[in-house]
Amino acid sequence: HRDKSEIFADQVTDLLAANDIRVWLSDTACPTPAVSSFIVDQGAFGGVMITASHNPAIFNGFKIKDSLGKSADPEVTQWVERYIDTQDPHGLSRHSVTKADHAALPPRPTVVTTSLVTPYLQRLKRAADIEMIARQPLKILVNCLYGSGSGVMTKLFSLGGAHGIQITEMNAHRDITFGGINPEPLAYNVRDMQQRMASEHFDLGLIFDGDADRIGAMVPGGEFLSTQDIYVLLLWHLTKNKRWQGRVVKSFNITDRVDRLALVTGCPLVTTPIGFKHIAPYLLKADTLIGGEESGGFAMRGYIPE
């Protein structure tokens, strides 16, 4: 949903196709996890997400995903950076693609424009009991923060029949300024949502960041749940309600309440440096239960390491 993201995505597609690489191009703005999910579904070599995540609106960026759907290792991204500094394939790496450049490039027979969101929703439906949740008489307010998570929750629960649940989305339209804030699920960015939670009596509030790979939450009345609280609740649910066991992985700036809960539930604990890229390798191991970071990224057993 950032300014000119479609143009950047098209340029990346052109360059990959010009190097005889098959490309699936999303037909709409999509969450970063949708790219990761599609990579795994298709057995792709990797993927690219055009996003600047939770950063200010003036920025855009280039996320690289590997064949497992996780963020590329630092060795890979550093190699790409060095290559850009030393190479200039097709004469396009130092300037924007113009109409003349497009005319010089070969056709794109290896490019398929398709939905990445639809198969992502199907993966989410397999990962959780969406039909059971959809039957619950819950009012949920979803703050999309003008990002690529817009519409996702509504579509997801429509797959479950949506018999009792009511999903209301706010800030779900495209605004390349993100309403004047950084699209990050922090309390000071969602005061308008806190007011609605209280006045309209919602049972739960969910907040996505700009590319919908991180989450925040609110309880009835509008009290903001920190990512620290969310991690503790997720771990409690997995160990107490589902009775799962396994390794608990956290970045070192996550609350020590996770340490204490891991101890009393008999789960081994691993603490990593900041950044989900340090957590993702543990998620590839069958004995890992959950991994999470302070900025709101979480992943659990049986899901993509993202």
Model-predicted segments: where are they?
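N-terminal small/polar loop signature for handling phosphorylated ligands or for N-terminal nucleophile
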Residues: H1-F59, K155-M218
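Glycine-rich phosphate-binding loop
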Residues: A44-F59, M197-P220, F224, C267-E306
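Short gly/pro/ser/thr-enriched loop/turn and capping motifs at secondary-structure boundaries
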Residues: C30-P33, N55-I58, S71-A72, W79-V80, ...
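Proline/glycine-rich low-complexity loops and linkers
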Residues: D27, R82-Y120, V219-A299
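Conserved beta-strand elements of the Class I
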Residues: G46, K139-L141, V249
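Gly/Ser/Thr-enriched, mixed-charge loops and adjacent short helices
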Residues: N60-E200
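Predominant activation on well-ordered alpha-helical scaffold segments within soluble catalytic domains
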Residues: T13, A17, S36, E81, ...
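Short, surface-exposed connector motifs at secondary-structure boundaries
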Residues: A17-R22, M132-I140, T239-G246, L263-T265
